Design a protein with these regions (language model features):
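ABC transporter nucleotide-binding domains
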Residues: 1-141, 145-148, 154
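Short, surface-exposed beta-strand/loop "edge" segments at domain boundaries and coil↔beta transitions
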Residues: 101-106, 180-184, 207-212
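C-terminal coupling/interaction segments
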Residues: 191-239
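Alpha-helix N-cap/helix-start and coil->helix boundary motif
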Residues: 44, 140, 181, 222-223
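ABC transporter nucleotide-binding domain
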Residues: 117-203
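Residue-level marker of positions within ordered structural domains that often coincide
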Residues: 55, 95, 179, 227, ...
Length: 239
């Protein structure tokens, strides 16, 4: 999938991607941030082609997914809008029975309605307990509701890797009441920011009982946690 070997070892589904690429690609589906489809073909020709070359492609399922869009099967790929191109590509990918689905900025080019519909379809039409979906995206807030695990990376280095369940237990966000701001800060938050003029403090491995009397406590949104971890990592590098 374009990864460059620098150090260490890598296995995907128990296979070495460098030695067992042919076997691996039978079990892996991948969509990049740019949908590349033959522009001279019609939509129907693309579907027939994929049906002929990929043994795990389910044409009927693809047509069902495609029927929820405004894409006509008689249309040439070259006349499709960017959003339609992505929808067509995703319809094909989601109709392939693969154990691992890798999505790189999958909703790039789609408007808000289609982005929400896509993730809803992803869970309803593709995911089951035997499949894994790996999503690489900068639009963190869009995928929070479908995540089971999260990996934050900064300049090629993993700075956080944990389950969402564990993250929600480990990190807490406090909006302290005005009278308790200084007391809250004395508990050593790992990050703080202003939101509409109000202090928001992020704590790691701090008991909720120590915070609950100081203001409003809740697990942070993934996007807010991401920004906080990136800022914290940057300061550590610069120190």
């Amino acid at each position: 999938l374009g990864l460059i070997n620098t150090e260490g070892n890598l296995e995907v589904l128990g296979l070495d991607p460098r030695k067992d690429r042919h076997k691996l690609l039978k079990e892996v589906c991948y969509i990049t941030d740019v949908a590349v489809l033959p522009k001279w073909m019609t939509v129907n020709q693309v579907l027939q082609y994929v049906d002929g070359v990929h043994p795990s492609f389910n044409l009927e399922k693809c047509l069902t997914i495609l029927s929820r869009t405004n894409i006509k099967r008689s249309s040439k790929v070259r006349v499709l809008s960017r959003g339609m191109m992505v929808q067509l590509h995703l319809s094909i990918v989601m109709a392939i029975d693969a154990k691992l689905l890798v999505l790189d900025e999958p909703t790039l080019g789609l408007d808000l309605v289609y982005r929400k519909e896509f993730y809803s379809q992803l869970i309803e039409d593709y995911y089951d307990g035997d499949k894994t979906i790996l999503i690489s995206t900068h639009q963190v807030e869009e995928i929070e509701g479908v995540l089971s695990d999260a990996v934050f990376m900064n300049q090629g280095r993993v700075v956080l890797h944990d389950s969402i369940e564990s993250i929600n237990k480990k990190f807490l966000e406090l909006r302290p009441n005005q009278d308790f701001i200084e007391k809250a800060k004395s508990l050593r938050p790992i990050h703080q920011r202003l939101e509409l003029g109000r202090e928001v403090l992020l704590f790691e491995d701090t008991e909720i009982d120590k915070l609950s009397n100081l203001g409003e406590v809740r697990p942070p949104f993934i996007a807010d946690l991401f920004m906080a971890i990136m800022d914290k990592t940057k300061k550590e590098i610069e120190a």
